[in-house]
Structures are given as structure tokens and as C-alpha cells.
A protein has these predicted regions:
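Conserved short histidine dyad/triad with adjacent acidic residue
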Residues: 13-37
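Short acidic-glycine-tyrosine-enriched beta hairpin
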Residues: 56-74
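Short, small-residue-biased leader/transition segments that mark boundaries at the very start
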Residues: 3-4
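Double-stranded beta-helix
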Residues: 82-127
């Protein structure tokens, strides 16, 4: 049992419905890993979205997610997903079983940019 907690992999699928609050897309809460050096992979299954990333220096960038796209999230990088389409958006993830999650950092300080719809397109806007 314990060896899988230390050396295993977790897999998960997330579903995000389309929509916005104001002009900000529906998104996941976002997190760093508790074991900050742990990486993660995301891949698109259905619909379209954006992977929003922020390093420990609070630099923010985004990558377009679509069915079949594969994305590497290095250790030390916070991440969240947003549904930028008009249909259900789903993606899969794989991460080390000892990565843990640190949601508190994002809850307390947020991301340094927001993904908003501007002129009908997703755009990162610094805060």
C-alpha cells in the first residue's frame, strides 16, 4: 500500500461546463503541488479550453487545450483550466501519487492574470 502512495501515479478526468461570470470563463480553482517539484500531464478529451499556468515568480501564460493535445506542467508551476468553448470541456490528468495539492496559495493570492473573453476571444489580463 505505502509504496503506491510514494511511487505511484494518479489519473483523473475533469468536466467543466461552458459559461462565464461576467466575461471570465468558468474554470477550476487552480493549485500548486504540495511537493512543489512534482510535475503533471494534462491532455484534452472533449471540447476546448485553456490551461493557465503560473510559476513561483507569478509569471502567467496559457496553452490552448483541444481533443488529443498533450501538455506538460513542470514542478513549481501552478495550474488551472478554463472552458473557453460552448460545449462540455473534459480533460485527463496524470500526476505522481505523492504530489499533494496546495490550494491555499491560490486561494490567498490568486493568479497574477485572469482569462477573460475580449472581442470574442480568450485573453490573459494581468491583475
Amino acid at each position: 500500500g505505502d509504496v503506491y502512495k510514494r511511487q505511484g501515479l494518479y489519473f483523473g478526468i475533469t468536466y467543466l461546463h461552458p459559461g462565464k461570470v461576467g466575461n471570465e470563463y468558468f474554470m477550476t480553482k487552480g493549485h500548486f503541488h504540495a511537493n512543489i517539484d512534482r510535475a503533471e500531464f494534462y491532455w484534452g478529451l472533449e471540447g476546448e479550453g485553456m490551461l493557465i499556468l503560473m510559476d513561483q515568480l507569478r509569471r502567467v501564460w496559457a496553452e490552448r487545450i483541444f481533443p488529443g493535445s498533450l501538455h506538460y506542467i513542470p514542478g513549481g508551476v501552478a495550474h488551472r483550466m478554463a472552458n473557453t468553448g460552448n460545449t462540455l470541456f473534459s480533460f485527463a490528468a496524470c500526476w505522481p501519487s505523492d504530489a499533494g495539492h496546495n490550494y491555499r496559495e491560490i486561494a490567498d493570492h490568486g493568479f497574477a492574470a485572469r482569462l477573460l473573453e475580449v472581442d470574442g476571444k480568450p485573453q490573459l489580463i494581468g491583475v
